[in-house]
Amino acid sequence: MNIKRNQNNSIDNNLSIDSNPSPIKKVKNHLDFSKSYNEDDEPSNDLDLSFNTSNISNLSNINGEEDNDDDDRENEPKDIDNPNPSITTTTATSTNSTLVKKTNNFLDFNFAFEPNKEEDDEEEDLNISLTTEDILLSQIELLKAEWDYITYNKSPPLVLQSVYHQSNKDSERSIQILKKKGTIRLFQIATSLNDYCIIITTDYIKNIELLKIENTTIPNKIKPETLTNNMKNSSPIKSAPIDTILLKRSEILDLFIKKLIPNFNEVSITRSKLFQLLSIVNDDHHQQENIITHLVQCGLLLQKDDCTFTFSVPGAGGFFLNLMKGRKEILSNIQRLKYKEILKKDLLKKKLKYSNVQMQLLIKDLLGLNKIKIIPTTQGELIRCVQFDEL
């Protein structure tokens, strides 16, 4: 009977402990993180029984001490190492919720792999602002940086089409895109029929603006044999009637910039088309001769025949002459070698006698014209002459 009473008392004690858990048990329940990870799962009876049977004696002792020392606990100073249970409960609860949130974020694949919206917006803005025209123009800008501004300061910076073709295999399509937009202009090199150079339109206009200030003509640019008999014998300003007001050079250049450049982007132009774009009446022959004279003297036009003119680059005659000399000198030097080939590093060390164009630029030019080719070797890049015909 005593054994049964003891068993009943122990069961009653267990029920009382479970129904009125102490603060310490509350803290332990809050610190039990397994409950937060498995909120939807049903509680395990085995775990609860093992906890109760293993800790009944300890919890009963703690409850007894709490009942006996209630009066003394009010007068005792607060221990820093043993904080207030309510505060501990709050801290544990917040820590528990933080861990649950981190765990949920870790398990939420949408949250983990969601891209940064601000970075996406910046990338979209960058892709929208960077067009095909900008990319192609940047390639020409890089090649333009190789221009010798000191030696050829009278000419706008230009890029040889052969050099651009060597760096961009789809150069023909790229040039047509930029040319159609009016971003660049194409000019035929006077010393060759199949050579062209590229000039950015803004650089071309800046160069023409400088011609307004200069009162003298560009030296070594206009030769008497390039002019027709009518232009040689005519003196538009003197022979014009008194009532005819001839345009000044600055006025003609303004018409050229504002009316011709935006509306015409070909290599050559006919006489009638030129005056149509400049809004010059066909019957006013004195004014027409006056305009042609000034444009030829400024180096903007070269007369191809009686009815056709080709556009030229002001001040670039010296560069084109040195370009042709440099091409021939390099090819002739390679042709004189036994195997008609030379290492690129050895060629770069040589100095040209008849040209002041940079050796690196001439090599790119000849590669673009398919006059030479580069073969990689163990000693470095080898330059071999492919053909040596009349340039």
Swiss-Prot record:
Listed GO MF terms: ATP binding; protein serine kinase activity; protein serine/threonine kinase activity
Span of the signal peptide: none
One matching Pfam family: Stk19
Major subcellular location class: nucleus
Biased composition (Acidic residues): 64-74
Record keywords, A-Z: DNA damage, DNA repair, DNA-binding, Nucleus
Region called Disordered, residue ranges: 1-95
Cellular compartments annotated: Nucleus
Gene Ontology BP, a term: positive regulation of Ras protein signal transduction
Bias (Low complexity) ranges: 1-24, 49-63, 82-95
InterPro entries: STK19-like (IPR018865)
Transmembrane segments: none
Family per record: Belongs to the STK19 family.
Physiological role: DNA-binding protein which is required for efficient transcription-coupled nucleotide excision repair.
Record protein name field: Winged helix repair factor 1
Organism: Dictyostelium discoideum (Social amoeba)
Taxonomic classification: Eukaryota, Amoebozoa, Evosea, Eumycetozoa, Dictyostelia
Name of the gene encoding the protein in the UniProt record: WHR1
